[in-house]
Structures are given as structure tokens and as C-alpha cells.
Amino acid sequence: MENLKKRFDVLQDLLMNIYEQGSDTLESQIEHWQALRREAVLLYYARQNGVLRLGYLPVPPLATSEAKAKQAISMVLQLQSLQQSPYGTEKWTLVDTSIETFKNTPENHFKKGPINVEVIYDGDPDNANLYTMWKYVYYMDDNDQWQKTESGANHTGIYYLIGEFKHYYVLFADDANRYSKSGQWEVRINKETVFAPVTSSTPPDSPGGSRELPGSTANSKASSPTQQPQQACSDETTKRKRYGRRESSPTDSRCRRRSSSRQKKQGRRARSRTRSRCSSTQTRSRSTSRRSRSTSRGNRRCRGDTPRGQRGVSTSSRGRGRGSRRSSSSSSPTPRTKASQRGCDTRSVRDSGISPGDVGRKLQTVSGRNSGRLGRLLEEALDPPVILLRGGANTLKCFRNRAKLRYRGHYKAFSTSWSWVAADGTERLGRSRLLVSFTSFKQRSGFLDLVRFPKGVDWSLGSFDKL
């Protein structure tokens, strides 16, 4: 007991000397965190042996000491890594290397030079928020090398530069939805207005902004009525979330359920108009009735993009049954789009059917065992399946390194992390992406059953013509 108390007093004297000296070298900051680590380990050992007080200091619970020890170990590793970089010789104070600064937005980055950014909503000085913009931000790139960059602010938010890309770590529109009534705000830096009042509509080139692909305007005019509920649903999702989701993402299930009833009603009207334009022969009547049943099932999960002028083709691009094959063969030949062959992975290929022109797009040779000649042709027509992961760059990179060893044999390949870039600029949009490819849909299903994705990482399904 006395020996334990003496060691604890020595650590307290060491910490007091560090605080009194106020050194601004990185070596002294590493020494400070090493002392905090030893202090947490000593308190953990004391509590584990039933000691409840060391001098006048109560011994904290085991969980508290363990958390502080792990926190100190993490900071020591980060500072030692920074010490090996060209920025290790700069001035580093206790505030610059504190856990509060390191965990502040942007998280897990070293930062220097805090600057106050005031955002005033609706022109009311009493209705304002204060944000911290850091003059310099130190981050680790994909090659595990420390980089130093500058931070800035505009009408969209506060960002730091990664090369020529702007990575936003504060978006003013997020708080404007809660605090602003008119959707307007102005930005002040050091009590000087740098941006006049703007509305809360997110600019197209900012993260979370809606962006149309070329030809999307023309396609929206010619789309069937079944698309209108999903377009309104996607607009609502863009306003509510920072990053857009694909329809295959699990986060959009609630949005699809809300519009399913409207899709059914409008789908019936669209099919009735399609049948009125089709030939009145008995064969096409039977195919239309069968197609309507398969379409009603397909519309629950897949979205249709059928042009109005296309005769005898199902309004759902993925709800294909035997009737849809018969009707498409009786009409004029129409090439199928690539999007109509993706998404509904859980449906059987034998039930849905694939046209002969699509056979041969799969990269891997399919075994004909227990499937027959027809089943092998249908399987060969499928595109290679993939999983798209979205999350932080470091999180995705760590997950890839662990999964490559832990789940070997349950996937084909991993990609490096990448990001979307704005069409009219060089800004990165949203979070980082990572692709996982598979040799078959069965392998992908087994991978999803086996793997547990990290917190904050979402995924969606897809496929490509070639990898």
C-alpha cells in the first residue's frame, strides 16, 4: 500500500512539472500522455486490489481507469506518428494535443488556430450559433502520411482542403432547419459579415446537393406515372439527409413503403393505357394479364422506367415473367437497358428469364451441374455482383484490411476508397466509397450473412457488366 502511494506521488509530481513548464515541443507532449497512461494503469491496479483511496484521491472504478488508459495509449501512438512527419518540429502545446481538441470537429484530426464563426438566422442577433473554424488541420492520407492543410468557410459551411477538394465538417443548413423560420442565415467571421443572408437550399455543388445526370430532364418527362411518387420521395430524402441513398439501400425502405400504395394505383392506370394501345389479339391479351400480375409483384421492390411508346413490354423493368417474354417477342425488338438487369438479386433467374442477346455478360464460367442447359444459359447472362460501402475513409480502409484476412474466400476483390466529385468543380461529394466484388450472387449473400459492418457504414447492392 505504501509503495503504491509513493509511485502515485511520483507521477503527480511529474505531471505538475509538465504543467508548470508549459513546454511547446512534441516530445514533452508525448511525455505528458505517457505519464497519464501510467497513472491510469496504477489506479486500475489499485482498484483491482481493493484500494479505494490513494492519499486524498478516491480511486475511480475499473471501467473509468481502463478507458483513460486506452485513451492515453491512442494519443501516444498518434503523437509518435506525427513526430516522424515533417510537422514534428512545429510548436505543439498542451491544448493542441489535448483529447478535447483531437476529438473536436473534424474528429480524430490535430488542429491549430481556432477561429470563431457566427451564423445568424433570420437576421436576429439573438438567434445565432457559434462554430469553430481551425486555421490549420493535420490529417492522415490514404498512404498513412500526415498532411497539413488550411481550413475555410463559405455560405455552405466550414471545410478543410484536401488538395483542391473541399471536405466540409460543418454544414450550416443542418442547424438552419432547426433554428431558422425563413430559411435564411448570414455568416460572420471575427464579427465581420463575410456572406450575406442566404437561403437554406443546399447548392448543387455542395455535399448533399441534388445533382442531375445528363439527359435526366428529358427522361423525367417521358417516364411513366409510377415514377412520380419515388421522385417526390427522393426529393424529401435529399432535404432530410446529407447524403443521397440508392433505392437498394436499406435506409430507403421506409420511403418506398410510404409510396407503395400510390405506385399500385398509378401502375394500374399506366397498364390499362398500355393495353389499349397494344394489339387486341388473343395472345397479347393473355400476355398482358400475366404481365400485370408479375408487374404488381415487381413494383414492390423494383422501379420501372418503361417509355410510353414501347408496346407490349412490362411497365416494371425487373418484374419479368413468362408473359413478359412472350409479349416482348411478339412486338418489335427492343434492346434492354443495363439498369433493368440489376437490383432484384433475390428473384430467381429461371423465373424471370433473360433474352438470348444478353447471354455471355458474366465474367465467370458457370457450372452446368444440377441446372441443365437452359439454367446455365440464364446464369451466364447475369452481371458480376458487387456491394457499395459508404463511410469514413479511415473506417473503410480499416474494415478492408480486417476483412481481407478474416473473410478470405467469401469475396473476389476489394477496391481502394474513392469519392464522387462535383460535375462543375473538384469538391468531393459525400462520404468515401468502397466496392466489394463477388463471383456469384450466392457468394455475396453468404458474405452479407457472415460479415458485420462497422458503425456508421451503410451498404447497397449492385452489379457491373465488367470488373
Swiss-Prot record:
Query: What ranges does the record list as Basic residues composition bias?
Result: 255-276, 287-301
Q: Which GO terms describe its biological process?
A: DNA replication; DNA-templated transcription; regulation of DNA replication; viral DNA genome replication
InterPro entries named in the record:
E2/EBNA1_C_sf (IPR035975), Nucleotide-bd_a/b_plait_sf (IPR012677), Papillomavirus_E2_C (IPR000427), PPV_E2_N (IPR001866), Reg_prot_E2 (IPR033668), Regulatory_protein_E2_N (IPR036050), Regulatory_protein_E2_N_1 (IPR042503), Regulatory_protein_E2_N_2 (IPR042504)
Question: Which is a Pfam family this sequence falls into?
Answer: PPV_E2_N
Locate the region DNA-binding domain: 383-467
| Localization terms from the record | Host nucleus
List UniProt keywords, sorted A-Z. Answer: Activator, DNA replication, DNA-binding, Early protein, Host nucleus, Phosphoprotein, Repressor, Transcription, Transcription regulation
Q: Where is the composition biased (Polar residues)?
A: 216-235
Which residues are connected by disulfide bridges in this protein?
A: none
The entry lists its GO molecular-function terms as:
DNA binding; DNA-binding transcription factor activity; nucleotide binding
Q: What is the first-listed, main subcellular location in coarse terms?
A: host cell
Q: Please give the GO cellular component terms listed in this UniProt entry.
A: host cell nucleus
- Region Transactivation domain, as annotated, extends over 1-201
Processing and modification events after translation: Phosphorylated.
**Spans of biased composition, class Low complexity?**
197-210, 277-286, 309-318
User: Where is the segment annotated Disordered?
Assistant: 196-367
Task of the protein: Plays a role in the initiation of viral DNA replication. A dimer of E2 interacts with a dimer of E1 in order to improve specificity of E1 DNA binding activity. Once the complex recognizes and binds DNA at specific sites, the E2 dimer is removed from DNA. E2 also regulates viral transcription through binding to the E2RE response element (5'-ACCNNNNNNGGT-3') present in multiple copies in the regulatory regions of the viral genome. Activates or represses transcription depending on E2RE's position with regards to proximal promoter elements including the TATA-box.
HAMAP family (alphabetical): PPV_E2 (MF_04001)
Instruction: Tell me its family.
Output: Belongs to the papillomaviridae E2 protein family.
On subunit structure and binding partners, the annotation says:
Binds DNA as homodimer. Interacts with protein E1; this interaction greatly increases E1 DNA-binding activity. Interacts with protein L1; this interaction enhances E2-dependent replication and transcription activation. Interacts with protein L2; this interaction inhibits E2 transcriptional activity but not DNA replication function E2. Interacts with protein E7; this interaction inhibits E7 oncogenic activity. Interacts with host TAF1; this interaction modulates E2-dependent transcriptional regulation. Interacts with host BRD4; this interaction mediates E2 transcriptional activation function.
Q: What is the name listed in the Swiss-Prot or TrEMBL entry for this protein?
A: Regulatory protein E2
